[in-house]
């Protein structure tokens, strides 16, 4: 089998491809990310940037204490982030644990949120430590319950041990289960990958295996979505597009808590992958607290006053 005509899926083919990738210039990546982080957006464009960021949020609750009531409240906010202003866009998705998918999907449909997808974390999130049978069942259960997006985690131990074929095969199998029913986001847990070179390699590995999105982190490990890491991933999707004519999305998650952070991410996207990626179809932000700050800043632009942070 050929994957984009670049590898055949074997361990030797994957190693040959990945080991030929150019190394990441650490100083250069960090300097460029820092430089782009100083870019400001004109006041006339700030409302657009804030609303674009809102539309890209994967509104998330992934806590052991999650309840059906909490998930329904999250869905209400996802559809109408500001109940007093119907012009505020809905978010990109609601992201929950497997057992909350049906509750989220049913409630979204009941409140006029059919357009908001439900994303489910899968494959023994957040550790990824389980048998393939468990990971497959985890994913199938989520899709059967109504998940339209699957956020799977890779086996970081296998990747760091150089077992690229094992990681690749797991992604391929989960992608097969998703089929045309669900988009697949592949979580790397970049805080455990040690080097930017590893981030670049795993980005290509996931894209070759069929990922629709590549995602930085579970949000459970720090550091998470640092600007240099996101930059490296955006460079990877840009270059992969040049190779294959296939656009892959990027989802930073973890540590993006305010509007300033979100706008920095949009600048990174625009200046690295390009403006085509400035859409929820190709860029998402995994967050829980971020939405409140985006709404506060949007109201400040409109009225000159801050609203309550407890939107």
Ranges and model annotations:
Residues 62:
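A short, histidine- and acid-enriched strand-loop-helix "catalytic/donor-clamping" loop
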